[in-house]
From Swiss-Prot:
The gene is maf. Belongs to the Maf family. YhdE subfamily. HAMAP family: Maf. Keywords: Cytoplasm, Hydrolase, Nucleotide metabolism. It holds the Pfam family Maf. Its main location: cytoplasm. Its EC number is 3.6.1.9. This is dTTP/UTP pyrophosphatase.
Length: 191
């Protein structure tokens, strides 16, 4: 059985793989998350996921390596991870009472074999009251997530509707990822 590496420091992606009974090691990548602004959104997340996986695979040539990347797009603008609370507040106010799209790209590499895909989901936020927004910002939950919220945590209180896969919004579309991992003979460890 091949070693399976998650090229991510995301505690959410790690937790999702654990709850699905995958055995893996975590090896964060050190990749600049820059991209050509003319790229399509699905191209951005696929390319960044591939770069993350490739940077880890370069040091672990016999391992199956999974990289992932997520972006939030609202009115044509990319919302990455906020640099500070003020930026998080600006992002969340923009998302208030509107719909945005979350794109997640996944890349799985093993030697010369590569499988890269993306998925998208639409998320609609309720109108954010100043009180709810301030409580959320005080929690610290906004600073390490694209778009300044985590749908799988405290940020769920803002969401009124999802069109698409919840796990795509959370950062790792599990059903599609599981099918892709099977192509590399990586399966949940049930026994």
């Amino acid at each position: 059985m091949n070693t399976f590496l998650l090229a991510s420091s995301s505690p959410r992606r790690s937790e999702f793989l654990k709850q699905c009974h995958y055995q893996f090691f975590t090896q964060p990548s050190n990749v600049e998350e820059t991209f050509d602004p003319t790229w399509e959104n699905d191209t951005i997340v696929k390319e960044l996921a591939r770069r993350k996986a490739a940077s880890v695979a370069a040091n672990h040539p016999n391992a199956v390596v999974l990289g992932a990347d997520t972006i939030v797009v609202h009115n044509g603008k990319h919302l990455g991870k906020p640099a500070n609370v003020a930026e998080a507040k600006t992002m969340l106010m923009a998302l208030s009472n509107s719909t945005h799209t979350v794109y997640t790209g996944v890349a799985i590499l093993h030697g010369n074999k590569e499988h890269v895909f993306s998925d998208a989901a639409k998320v609609t936020f309720d109108e954010l009251t100043p009180e709810r927004l301030e409580r959320y910002l005080q929690s610290g939950d906004s600073l390490d997530k694209a778009g300044a919220y985590g749908i799988q945590s405290f940020g769920a209180i803002f969401v009124s509707r999802i069109e698409g896969d919840f796990y795509t919004v959370a950062g790792l579309p599990l059903s599609k990822t599981a099918k892709a991992l099977e192509k590399f003979h990586i399966y949940p460890n049930i026994g």
